[in-house]
Amino acid sequence: EGSGGSGSSGNFTTGSNVHMSSVTNTSNAGTGGTGTNTGTNTGTGTGTGTGTGTGTGTGTGTGTGTGTGTGTGTGTGKGAGAGTGTATNETAGPGTTTTTTTRSTTTAATAASPPVTLTESLLNK
C-alpha cells in the first residue's frame, strides 16, 4: 500500500525479508490526504513620487471705503502763525530795519522861589 500521507501513487515499500527475485509486489495507488496551508504574509513597501502641476486663476474684486479726517493739521498751522514770520523778517532784513528811539523827558515843576528881602546895605551899594 502506498503511503497515505504523501498523496503520491505508484510508490511501494518492501520488507527486508522479501526476496525480490521471486516475488513481485504490486501496490495499489495510495490515496493521499488533503491539507490546508495557512500563513500570514506581511510586507512593507516604500515609494517615492514626483509630480508637477500648473494652475491658472482669475479674480475680480470691488471695494468701497469711507473715511473721516482729523483736525491735527490745525495745530501745525498755529505754530506757523504769520505774526512770527513778520517779526523774523523785520529783524533779519538788512538795510530795512530802522530803529527810532524816542525819549520823553518830563521836567519836574519848579518850586516857587522864596521872597528876597533887600536890606539897606545892599541897596546902598
UniProtKB/Swiss-Prot annotation:
Alphabetical UniProt keywords? Biological rhythms, Cytoplasm, Nucleus, Phosphoprotein, Repeat
* UniProt PTM comment: Phosphorylated with a circadian rhythmicity, probably by the double-time protein (dbt). Phosphorylation could be implicated in the stability of per monomer and in the formation of heterodimer per-tim.
Q: Which stretches does UniProt call biased (Polar residues)?
A: 116-125
Where is the protein situated, by its record's location annotation?
Answer: Nucleus; Cytoplasm, Perinuclear region
**Superkingdom classification of source:** Eukaryota
Residue ranges with Gly residues bias:
30-84
- Keyword Nucleus assigned to the entry: answer is yes
The biological processes this protein is annotated with in GO are: rhythmic process
Q: Where is this region: 28 X 2 AA approximate tandem repeats of G-[TA]?
A: 30-86
Its GO CC terms are: nucleus; perinuclear region of cytoplasm
- sequence repeat feature ranges: 30-31, 33-34, 35-36, 37-38, 39-40, 41-42, 43-44, 45-46, 47-48, 49-50, 51-52, 53-54, 55-56, 57-58, 59-60, 61-62, 63-64, 65-66, 67-68, 69-70, 71-72, 73-74, 75-76, 77-78, 79-80, 81-82, 83-84, 85-86
Q: Region (Disordered): which ranges?
A: 1-125
Q: Does the keyword Transmembrane apply?
A: no
Low complexity compositional bias: what residue ranges? 85-112
Copy the domain comment: The run of Gly-Thr is implicated in the maintenance of circadian period at different temperatures. Deletion of the repeat leads to a shortening of the courtship song cycle period, and thus could be important for determining features of species-specific mating behavior.
Subunit comment: Forms a heterodimer with timeless (TIM); the complex then translocates into the nucleus.
The protein's role, per its UniProt record: Essential for biological clock functions. Determines the period length of circadian and ultradian rhythms; an increase in PER dosage leads to shortened circadian rhythms and a decrease leads to lengthened circadian rhythms. Essential for the circadian rhythmicity of locomotor activity, eclosion behavior, and for the rhythmic component of the male courtship song that originates in the thoracic nervous system. The biological cycle depends on the rhythmic formation and nuclear localization of the TIM-PER complex. Light induces the degradation of TIM, which promotes elimination of PER.
What's the protein called, per UniProt?
Period circadian protein
Which organism's genome codes for this protein?
Answer: Drosophila ananassae (Fruit fly)
